[in-house]
Amino acid sequence: MPVRPARCYRRIKGPPYTREEYIHGAPMIQIPKFDMGTTSAAARATFPMVAKLIVEERGQIRMQALEAARQMASKYLTKYVGDANYYLRLNVIPHHVLRENRMLAMAGADRLQEGMRLAFGSPAGRAARVEPGQILFYAEFKPEHLAHIKEAFRRAASKLPLPTRIVIEPKGDGDGKTATQG
């Protein structure tokens, strides 16, 4: 069956549905990598700048959208910056299991099936629940690659169903503070 459009799952309705031990047939998380680029601590210490893609509205982002955004950003940065010159992390994990009450969708199906009110549905996918101000993507880089990082995040944001913003700042000193905060 085809995948329903993202507008069907963008808004949060009800409590999270995450307990896999009670869900039979829950789909696997189809995001193979959460860390891209240079992942060694020694190499990351040479990157003085940080970029964050931050979500502005509460909602759900399906794992297909997260994977598409991750691929867009990673491929662009690999092509124009090189794997050794950046670190990129996808910060959210799609734990919430989406349900779908499948209905017949063909000519004359209205006479065959009327459905059921408030039907529970069967597992159909996964999504990450996000809140305003939550970081979706985190990147470390050198100042000369700032334009490429912004473009990669812009391309990744075009694959997501919620509005986002890009924040660029100097890397902190390890205790959660940035260099400009003192």
From Swiss-Prot:
Coiled coil: none annotated. Keywords: Ribonucleoprotein, Ribosomal protein. PANTHER family: 60S RIBOSOMAL PROTEIN L10. It comes from the Archaea. GO terms for molecular function: structural constituent of ribosome. The keyword Ribonucleoprotein applies. It comes from Pyrobaculum arsenaticum (strain DSM 13514 / JCM 11321 / PZ6). One of its GO terms (biological process) is translation. One of its GO terms (cellular component) is ribosome. This is Large ribosomal subunit protein uL16. Belongs to the universal ribosomal protein uL16 family. The gene is rpl10e.
